[in-house]
Curated annotation (Swiss-Prot):
It is found in: Cytoplasm. The gene is treZ. Signal peptide: none annotated. The record marks 400 as: Transition state stabilizer. It comes from Deinococcus radiodurans (strain ATCC 13939 / DSM 20539 / JCM 16871 / CCUG 27074 / LMG 4051 / NBRC 15346 / NCIMB 9279 / VKM B-1422 / R1). Pfam families: Alpha-amylase, CBM_48, DUF3459. This is Malto-oligosyltrehalose trehalohydrolase.
Length: 600
């Protein structure tokens, strides 16, 4: 009988090299088809075994809580670890075909026939992100079906696919932000090789692929790390999602940094978007964000690391060495401008041409000003002068800003927003890095609602938790808020691809193609230097001017209700009169309500 291990035992020195595949936990196929090495770390179990294809085998202790066994089985073998007689899923599993509570499958990453050897990544300045939820992007909701849409995205003019989280989570549907087994791609979307095929196909078309990862919490069902060692977690801090991940524990750091490397190395993703980085709490000497950036940039090639962070901290780039930041202020000022809405966190924004001009010029709205919203009272943000324009990721819609509304309605479906205003939204012509959400380019009629698949008390708790989280928005108290656990809520959110070629959908799609073509081909707009940009306003007309050695471009967006002639707009410079684009497709220099033009 194996003796009880001390709390948080230290693995042998040979297991401190994170990059060495010979020290990986989980199931690792051996070279030449010689079998599979099964390995785990536990601080609590007295007896340890592995059950492979129904047969149980006692594992050998290597000291320091490490157990190992090599068996003559290959890819496709199913297994569970057995801790003190209890069958326990592997939190390092590379695939969980039957879900997060089931057996893992041995996966050999080396058998996929990659064809992207000539792909060397994408620079952030060249990125036009297109956010995709695999389950609702196509009727089938699979990796293979998503791959069939890649030629359309290439023709549209986007350059990088931003995939919502894929780490395995409980249930048959969900957004992905309740991942429980970080190393296993979500099985209902397809097998690991299907995901590899999606990335490979994108690279063949010249499209980058980025993955959204969640390293601030685990989902409420299906995470078994604490069964192996409670020290993965801590009560020194917590979040709305539960106990904190203890990044002072070397195995937790290794779990996350190794996971990041896996997505980039084994699946060929071009970069990662880190969800909610304010909640990646770490009191270690080197913050986990800094270590992640170092790990990713040392992989070779062009790999990018982006943060979703509302704090407006340039240090994320200048100190932690991340590459870019999903910022909220541009979206929030745009939404308040178009809708007049000032509930919840929108209360901190005033909207209008002047506010948008300031936000675009400075990168974000808050750079040290006082923030007093939702019970918070503090200075927010710091000046962003050290950042380049591409460091800011701008959007007018994303999964949160649509899905966290009571009915999951899109911006153009909001009260008071006309299609003229929606089409006039200017993010694609700014030097910041733009992001579109699936279907945005044709003003999709389908919502994107919050959905999950948790039964019983857990499902009820998730639903009630959302109402509490967004209690500052009056719509969440209504009886018409969709039930997140109902399958129909998920089905409602699937894109209707048939509508995009008709009526106003087709008209909007043509505009997005034209905007992205200009962004790509225009010699002035293609220059992303922030110092070339000036902004201002004349009443309700926002102007954004870009001047480079290649010429001058001026964007004018009428945010008022009165029609304005471009010649009548008072500007501190002479306005060029050559029309390059009118958001309503006209050939005149007149701005109706919500309309925009680009001149140069």
């Amino acid at each position: 009988m194996t003796q009880t291990q001390p709390v948080t035992p230290t693995p042998p020195a040979s297991f401190q090299t994170q990059h060495d595949p010979r020290t990986r936990l989980g199931a690792t196929p051996l070279p030449g088809g010689a079998g599979t090495r099964f390995r785990l770390w536990t601080s609590t179990a007295r007896t340890v075994a592995v059950r492979v294809n129904g047969t149980e085998h006692v594992m050998t202790s290597l000291g320091g809580g490490i157990y190992e066994l090599e068996l003559p089985v290959g890819p496709g073998a199913r297994y569970l670890f057995v801790l003190d007689g209890v069958p326990t899923p592997d939190p390092y599993a590379r695939f969980l075909p039957d879900g997060v509570h089931g057996e893992a499958e041995v996966v050999d990453f080396g058998t996929f026939d990659w064809t992207d050897a000539d792909w060397h990544g994408i620079k952030l300045a060249d990125c036009v992100f297109y956010e995709v939820h695999v389950g609702t992007f196509t009727p089938e909701g699979t990796y293979r079906a998503a791959a069939e849409k890649l030629p359309y995205l290439k023709e549209l003019g986007v350059t990088a696919i931003q995939v919502m989280p894929l780490a395995a989570f409980d249930g048959q549907r969900g957004w992905g932000y309740d991942g429980a087994a970080f190393y296993a791609p979500y099985a209902p979307y397809g097998r690991p090789e299907d995901l590899m095929a999606l990335v490979d196909a994108a690279h063949r078309l010249g499209l980058g692929v980025f993955l959204d990862v969640v390293y601030n919490h685990f989902g409420p069902s299906g995470n078994y790390l604490s069964s192996y060692a409670p020290s993965y977690f801590t009560d020194r801090f917590s979040s709305a999602w539960g106990m904190g991940l203890d990044y002072a524990e070397p195995h937790m750091r290794r779990y996350v940094t190794g996971n990041a490397r896996m997505w980039l190395r084994d699946y060929h993703f071009d970069g990662l978007r880190l969800d909610a980085t304010p909640y990646m709490t770490d009191d270690s000497e080197t913050h986990i964000l800094t270590e992640l950036a170092q790990e990713i940039h040392e992989l070779g090639g062009t790999h990018l690391l982006l943060a979703e962070d509302h704090r407006n901290l340039p240090d994320l780039v200048t100190v932690n060495h991340l590459d870019g930041i999903w910022t909220d202020d541009f979206h929030h000022e745009t939404r308040v401008t178009l809708t007049g809405e000032q509930e919840g966190y929108y209360a901190g924004y005033r909207g209008g041409a002047e506010a948008l001009a300031y936000t675009i010029r400075r990168g974000w709205r808050y750079e040290g000003q006082f923030w007093a919203v939702k019970g918070e009272e503090h200075e927010r943000g710091h000046p962003s002068d050290a950042l380049e324009a591409p460091n800011f990721v701008y959007c007018i819609q994303n999964h949160d800003q649509i899905g966290n509304r009571p009915l999951g309605e899109r911006l153009h479906q909001s009260d008071g927003v006309t299609l003229h205003e929606y089409r006039g939204a200017a993010a694609l012509l700014l030097p910041m890095t733009p992001l579109l959400f699936q279907g945005q380019e044709w003003a999709a009629s389908t919502p994107f609602q919050f959905f999950s698949d948790h039964a019983g008390e857990l499902g009820q708790a998730v639903s009630e938790g959302r109402k509490k989280e967004f209690g500052g928005f009056s719509g969440f108290s209504g009886e018409d808020v969709p039930d997140p656990q109902a399958e129909q809520t998920f089905l409602n959110s699937k894109l209707n691809w048939a509508e995009r070629e008709g009526g106003e959908h087709a008209r909007t799609l043509r505009l997005y193609r034209d905007l992205l073509r200009l962004r790509r081909e225009d010699p002035v707009l293609h220059n992303r230097q922030r110092e070339n940009l000036t902004t201002g306003h004349d009443g309700d007309v926002l102007w954004v001017r870009t001047v480079t050695g290649a010429g001058e471009r001026v964007l004018l967006w009428n945010l008022g209700q009165d029609t304005r002639a471009v010649a009548e707009v008072k500007l501190p410079f002479t306005v060029p009169r050559r029309l390059l684009l009118h958001t309503e497709g006209r050939e005149d220099l007149t701005l109706g309500a919500g309309e925009a033009v680009l001149v140069g």
